[in-house]
A protein has these predicted regions:
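Active-site diphosphate/adenylate-binding microenvironment
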Residues: 38-42, 46-47, 64-66, 377-456
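Glycine-rich, acidic loop regions that bind phosphate or pyrophosphate groups
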Residues: 3-9, 130-171, 271-375, 551
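Phosphate/pyrophosphate-binding active-site segments
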Residues: 4-31, 166, 325-420, 544-545, ...
């Protein structure tokens, strides 16, 4: 070593040298940890245990889709953004997990509005990523810009716009928490294009800190005591089970409760499956197209126990005359639902599961009320849902659904579109448990059926999935049938074809002097050829004598099938409580 080199080395401070080396290593680690916003987003989704993304690409989300190319999360390519969000709803309903949707900006984002609203009405957990123009272009009418935050504010639990790439983990973690806590619902994350390409070394997020956002799940002891006092005094008890029972997966607890105290049970449309169909205490669905036994029990009871239903107008179309002789208890996780429609004697803000757990742990003796139970059961036996008059020309939709119930042993996952077929499915399919029934309740969205069946099958691939759809709703989202052979999904689509918009026509027949204004299709496509074009096996049933044999063949077929069942254009859903009438004022019995 030369003298000059020796002198230089002697002058180096070992402490500074160590600090310099540590800084160099830190900088190297920082550079190695740098990821794009899109990569961070995928990491955040994986941390939330996301299995599927339902989406449709476009310019504003190309950085995201480039990251999806690695296939760390399975992406389901819908044929329309509305199909993507309805598929996510079906997935969420059956799996109990969060449905995740990714669409581009502008028209891609506006196309998911119906599905977001549908999920908001039916309390389904979704996280929807909408693409957005790059940050510098926001507010300047850039190509495919839309103010998604303003549009979705009334139809989401929360919405976000990513303004800093470092915020992505926190926003994603919060969004999943909000979507799944309390009353579940949709959350939107607006994702500007530049946020997908900017680099960051941010860590993933584990903490939740949302000021003012608190969820009450535990019932108060005083409310439990008050409820028990009411329970002990009642002689004509009825449980009304809504979607809150199925959402909280408290079906077994409810069955235990009603059997322990011998309480006749009514469900809402979205509460079907809350207690098994064959349970002797189950009276059926209540409301507009509910059973005679259910509506009479709601009218005659002296204690109505509402568990997770929001008293919507299809159940209680005349609120001031609803359950006129009853003291009403309403248990709901959403405080805003208490006293919103029906004034109640006792409102309990709690999770239905925790409420039932608290009750089932207590030893409560009720007044002897076997006469009331027999009365309700007699009503059920004397006034069942009608199959209707025998038809020598057309198939009967009621018989079709009833027979499919037998083929599937009441264990299939059933999705529906919206219309008459939806009500027939609700009336005649023998549901056994929660998670079997996937339908659009609060919003009543035509086009929901086929895409929701795709999400349902992905959520539970080992279960038989049946989709009931009318010829009107079928033509709104039938393009999603392409996904069935593409992803190997064995879904049986049962197309109830009456050549009309059946429910609209039924109302025109009853309330508009049979003026059938634009409710009859004067031309229809060949649905069997459509099935063939999409790679789906077609079965046409246009004669009543073919019904059972053809249904057996269709359900024995290994693969997706479209089963067209032709019914009379005059077939009606009965009974019916006309809008504005009390529940006991049923017509068509």
């Amino acid at each position: 070593m030369s003298k000059t080199q020796h002198e230089v080395n002697q002058n180096i401070d070992p402490l500074k040298m160590a600090e310099s080396l540590e800084l160099e290593q830190l900088n190297e680690k920082t550079l190695n940890d740098m990821r794009s916003g899109s990569e961070v987003l995928v990491e955040a989704l994986l941390k939330e245990n996301v299995d599927y993304l339902f989406g449709y690409p476009g310019g504003a989300v190309l950085p995201l889709y480039d990251t999806f190319y690695d296939g760390k999360i399975k992406h389901i390519l819908a044929r329309h953004e509305q199909g993507a969000v309805h598929a996510a709803e079906g997935y969420a309903r059956v799996s109990g997990k969060t449905g995740v949707v990714v669409v581009t900006s502008g028209p891609g984002a506006t196309n998911v509005m119906t599905g977001i609203t549908d999920a908001h009405c039916d309390s389904l957990p979704l996280v929807v990523f909408t693409g957005q123009v790059a940050t510098p272009g926001i507010g300047k009418d850039a190509f495919q810009e839309a103010d998604i935050l303003s549009m979705t504010s009334p139809i989401t639990k929360q919405n976000y716009q990513v303004k800093r790439v470092e915020d992505i983990p926190k926003i994603v973690h919060e969004a999943f928490h909000v979507a799944n806590s309390g009353r579940k619902g949709p959350v939107v994350i607006d994702f500007p294009k530049d946020m997908g390409v900017l680099a960051t070394n941010v860590d993933l997020c584990d903490e939740i800190n949302i000021p003012g956002y608190e969820v009450v799940t535990e019932p108060e002891n005083k409310d439990i005591d008050t409820f028990i006092s009411l329970l002990k005094e009642a002689k004509k008890l009825v449980v009304l089970a809504g979607a809150g029972i199925n959402q909280s997966k408290s079906n077994q607890l409810l069955t235990q409760f009603v059997n322990k105290h011998q309480i006749p049970t009514v469900t809402t449309l979205l509460g079907l499956g809350a207690v098994p169909y064959e349970d002797t205490l189950f009276l059926g669905m209540g409301g507009m197209h509910g059973s005679y036994a259910s509506n009479m029990a709601l009218t005659e009871c002296d204690l109505l126990i509402n568990l997770g239903s929001r008293f919507d107008d299809r159940l209680a179309s005349k609120p001031d005359a609803f359950a006129p002789n009853a003291k009403i208890v309403h248990v709901d996780i959403d405080p805003s639902e208490i006293n919103k429609v029906i004034h109640v004697d006792l409102g309990i803000i709690a999770d239905c599961k925790r409420f039932l757990e608290c009750l089932n742990d207590k030893n409560v003796e009720t007044i002897e009320h076997s006469d009331w139970v027999k009365h309700c059961q007699n009503n059920k036996q004397k006034h069942p849902f009608k199959l209707g008059e025998e038809d020598q020309v057309f198939c009967k939709p009621q018989q079709t659904i009833e027979y499919i119930g037998k083929i599937t042993n009441g264990e299939a996952i059933v999705t529906t579109d919206v219309g008459q077929h939806q009500m027939w499915a609700a009336q005649f399919y023998p549901f056994k448990n929660h998670g079997q029934w996937v339908t659009s309740g609060g919003l009543g969205t035509m086009g929901f059926g086929i895409p929701s069946s795709i999400g349902a099958k992905l959520a539970n691939p080992d279960k038989t999935v049946v989709c009931f759809v009318g010829d009107g709703g079928f033509q709104m989202t039938n393009q999603e049938m392409a996904l069935l052979p593409e992803y190997g999904l064995d879904v049986k689509i049962v197309l109830i074809n009456n050549g009309t918009l059946g429910m609209v026509k039924q109302w025109q027949d009853k309330f508009f002097n049979q003026r059938f204004s634009h409710s009859v299709f004067n031309g229809q496509p060949d649905f069997m050829k459509m099935a063939e074009a999409y790679g789906v096996k077609g079965f046409l049933i246009d004669k009543p004598e073919q019904l059972e044999e053809q249904l057996d063949a269709a359900f024995a077929y290994q693969g997706p099938a479209l089963i067209e069942v032709r019914i009379s254009p005059t077939e009606a859903v009965t009974p019916m409580v006309p809008s504005g009438k009390s529940n006991h004022e049923m017509e068509g019995l």
